[in-house]
């Protein structure tokens, strides 16, 4: 962790000033951020490491998701620059930044919490952090869908029973049930993700259930695609 204030060149250790053009809030200086990033780059070079991938955490950045976490996990080093106040002088972002990232459509008082979110989501993908690689491959967003519901003991809790299929020991049926639950949960809660998943899996054969019909594939404009993204009736 590097304190930007340590790189200021004024006696007051001031890191911000009023924005050109007027407006509320204060804007972080370019100079201390630039000098801090140069120091980080020099440190990496001295260690024989590649230049860090520089990410500025701003509300105006591109939305953060699991795909981006996997991309960042592939870099040798990543530097996260936390925004604050009204923002950061755009010139230092243009000069040093590889990208700007936002963790959601809301505003925080600073980028520190956002940096922790990014760091945690990236570090957990590193070898040895989780006991098994499968530990994150079955989770929400890994394959573009939300994760299926989870259950543990007791079998019945306050009159609510675990779905019978999970007690059968039939791994094929369990996988089919979980896949259907994952698709249905995504369709209901995140139709944007569901539509994207259907577009990327146009030939996916969905299992038939005891009640209702599964999504069928039809030929339309010489492309196979789902008839619709309507409700999938699931087994109990």
Task: Describe these PLM feature segments.
Residues 2, 55, 78-79, 99-101:
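Hydrophobic/aromatic beta-strand patches that form the interior of the parallel beta-sheet core
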Residues 125-164:
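Internal, active-site/partner-interface "lid" segment
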Residues 154-228:
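SAM-dependent methyltransferases
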Residues 15-36:
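Short, structured active-site "lid" loops
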Residues 29-84:
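S-adenosyl-L-methionine/SAH cofactor-binding core of RNA-modifying enzymes
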Residues 230-236:
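Conserved small/polar residues in nucleotide/adenosyl-binding loops
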Residues 1-7:
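A short beta-strand-loop structural module common to alpha/beta enzyme folds
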Residues 88, 92-139:
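Structured adenosyl-cofactor binding patch, chiefly the S-adenosyl-L-methionine
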């Amino acid at each position: 962790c590097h304190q930007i204030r340590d790189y200021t060149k004024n006696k007051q250790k001031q890191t911000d000033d009023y924005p050109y053009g007027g407006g509320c809030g204060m804007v972080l200086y370019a100079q201390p951020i630039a000098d801090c990033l140069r120091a980080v780059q020099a440190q990496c070079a001295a260690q024989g490491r590649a230049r860090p991938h520089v990410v500025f955490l701003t509300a105006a950045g591109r939305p953060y998701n699991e795909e981006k976490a996997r991309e960042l996990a592939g870099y040798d080093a990543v530097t996260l620059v936390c925004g604050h106040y009204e923002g950061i002088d755009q010139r230092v972002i243009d000069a040093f930044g590889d990208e700007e990232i936002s963790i959601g459509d809301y505003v925080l008082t600073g980028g520190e919490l956002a940096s922790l979110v990014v760091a945690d989501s990236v570090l957990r993908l590193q070898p040895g952090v989780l006991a098994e690689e499968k530990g994150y491959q079955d989770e929400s967003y890994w394959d573009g869908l939300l994760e299926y519901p989870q259950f543990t003991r007791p079998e019945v809790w306050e009159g609510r029973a675990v779905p019978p299929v999970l007690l059968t020991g039939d791994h094929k049926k369990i996988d089919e049930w979980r896949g259907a639950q994952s698709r249905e949960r995504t369709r209901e809660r995140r139709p944007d993700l569901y539509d994207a998943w259907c577009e990327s899996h146009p030939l996916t054969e969905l299992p038939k259930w005891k009640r209702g019909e599964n999504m069928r594939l039809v030929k339309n404009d010489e492309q196979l695609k789902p008839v619709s993204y309507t409700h999938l009736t699931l087994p109990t």
